[in-house]
Amino acid sequence: MTNIRKTHPLLKIVNHSLIDLPAPSNISAWWNFGSLLGLCLMIQILTGLFLAMHYTSDTATAFSSVTHICRDVNYGWLIRYLHANGASMFFICLYMHVGRGIYYGSYTYLETWNIGIILLFAVMATAFMGYVLPWGQMSFWGATVITNLLSAIPYIGTTLVEWIWGGFSVDKATLTRFFAFHFILPFIIAALVMIHLLFLHETGSNNPSGIPSDSDKIPFHPYYTIKDLLGFLV
């Protein structure tokens, strides 16, 4: 009987992406950050979903709802700190991943690299909007300063800033739309990650020696699945 993972229409895609994928035999720990970013994204989406159940995007109650999460919700403090520190870990992995790409010349894979740049900007935008949500003093300052940068655009700058704010200052409308975008963007990022991987698997990954590895490839599983799991544990 033929193995179901090689014949089933859906499992076949997973098989070609994560199991039987031919991968260079010499990629180092620098190639672990892609899978770590995937783990970070999953943690952020899961913890964010639970936080969104208790958060209120209203200027009068936003800060109180964050306090309520930390004090009254079962393990709410843990979920919040996982989400906040998970975001920091996300960026550490992101900068390492980009740094490795620059050092080892991954920018030659144009489609993969360009989607990666879009992903970087999308993650930065998501993080910025998340920073505003607790509606403390620094949230208000951050929202005002960063959005005000757009006012430097000639002619349309002021109108653009007021359009983003939803009024003449950072207020309830700003907080509500920032929460809406902060909620939806991670799912858009997840979709972009799929496209990023699609383009990567079209060309194959590069390797530390910088030479074509077509003549020396090994299956992704079990070699790199175990390597990635070790990265998760570390």
UniProtKB/Swiss-Prot annotation:
Classification via Pfam families: Cytochrome_B
Residues that bind heme b b566: 97, 196
One BP term from GO: mitochondrial electron transport, ubiquinol to cytochrome c
Membrane-spanning parts: 33-53, 77-98, 113-133, 178-198, 226-234
Membrane-topology annotation of the record: Multi-pass membrane protein
GO molecular function, one term: ubiquinol-cytochrome-c reductase activity
Key words of the record: Electron transport, Heme, Iron, Membrane, Metal-binding, Mitochondrion, Mitochondrion inner membrane, Respiratory chain, Transmembrane, Transmembrane helix, Transport, Ubiquinone
Binding-site positions, a ubiquinone: 201
Cofactor dependence: heme b
Disulfide links within the chain: none
PROSITE patterns from the UniProt entry: CYTB_CTER, CYTB_NTER
CDD domains: Cytochrome_b_N
SUPFAM superfamilies, per the entry: Transmembrane di-heme cytochromes
InterPro entries for this protein: Cyt_b/b6_C, Cyt_b/b6_N, Cytb/b6-like_sf, Cytochrome_b_N_euk/bac, Di-haem_cyt_TM
Compartment(s): Mitochondrion inner membrane
One term under GO cellular component: mitochondrial inner membrane
Residues that coordinate or bind heme b b562: 83, 182
Subunit and partners: The cytochrome bc1 complex contains 11 subunits: 3 respiratory subunits (MT-CYB, CYC1 and UQCRFS1), 2 core proteins (UQCRC1 and UQCRC2) and 6 low-molecular weight proteins (UQCRH/QCR6, UQCRB/QCR7, UQCRQ/QCR8, UQCR10/QCR9, UQCR11/QCR10 and a cleavage product of UQCRFS1). This cytochrome bc1 complex then forms a dimer.
Further comment found in the protein's record: Heme 1 (or BL or b562) is low-potential and absorbs at about 562 nm, and heme 2 (or BH or b566) is high-potential and absorbs at about 566 nm.
Functional summary from the UniProt entry: Component of the ubiquinol-cytochrome c reductase complex (complex III or cytochrome b-c1 complex) that is part of the mitochondrial respiratory chain. The b-c1 complex mediates electron transfer from ubiquinol to cytochrome c. Contributes to the generation of a proton gradient across the mitochondrial membrane that is then used for ATP synthesis.
Family as reported in the entry's similarity comment: Belongs to the cytochrome b family.
Protein name per the record: Cytochrome b
Organism: Lepus arcticus (Arctic hare)
